[in-house]
Amino acid sequence: MREVKAIVDSGNYDVIWTHGPVMSVVTRIAAREARRQGSKVWYLAHGFHFFSGAPLINWILYYPIEYIMSRYVDMLMTINEEDYTRALKFKARNVRKIHGIGLDVKKFMDHILSVDFYKKLRKSIGISDDDVMILSVGELKIHKNQKVIIKAIAKCNLDNQHYVVCGKGPDKTKLELLASSLNIRQKVHFVGFRKDIPDLCRVADIFVHPSVREGLGIAPLEAMASGLPLISSTVGGI
């Protein structure tokens, strides 16, 4: 708090733009004096932790904080309709909705691979031409919920199903251990952070996006632009 306040107070900023439920609270408290001096505070909510179907603890913990702290912001920006509708009932005087983040659909729709490249890319991951490749893209964190797909793969128990997980994050070891405990470690491929998502979407058969919380959801939009069948949760901005 002291470090943030020192930065805010020493900068003489016109606009202080904060993100995320925790850091935005810290920043708004730290910026009270700056606001009195004329600085504006903008808060971009990347998806409220409370939403239709969210755990009760999320509503108990996050809703009162967001409601109370909304009075200490000059503009509250949301990125999906559910958050926007709810934020209108808060104390913020200026609530906006960003209607969408740009996606270059041609980058995915017009992306064509040669047969040789298709085979080579799948082989590099450990997947044959006859296997069913299930793809997901996202941080390896609890709210991305990759574990539900790993459990589903184990329950289906089909020899030719392979789950390719793109991304990195703190839950990687837990997910690897889960796959091992279910005896499907050889079917779950953790390929890390990738810059060739358009290629991977073209060689995949199914895209999954099982998030339990999502502000907007760019990854499933990219999958749809690639023409992939999509299995997704229906939360937040999805």
Give residue spans per PLM region.
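Short glycine/serine-rich donor-binding loops of glycosyltransferases
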Residues: G217-P220, I238
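Short His-centered aromatic/hydrophobic patch
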Residues: T18-S24, A45
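Aromatic "clamp/platform" in nucleotide-sugar-dependent glycosyltransferases that forms part
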Residues: F193, V212
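A conserved mid-protein helix/loop that constitutes part of the nucleotide-sugar donor-binding site
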Residues: V132-K155, P170-E176
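Donor nucleotide-sugar binding/catalytic pocket of nucleotide-sugar-dependent glycosyltransferases
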Residues: Y67-Y118
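Nucleotide-sugar donor phosphate/pyrophosphate-binding loop at the beta->alpha transition
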Residues: R2, K40, F50-Y72
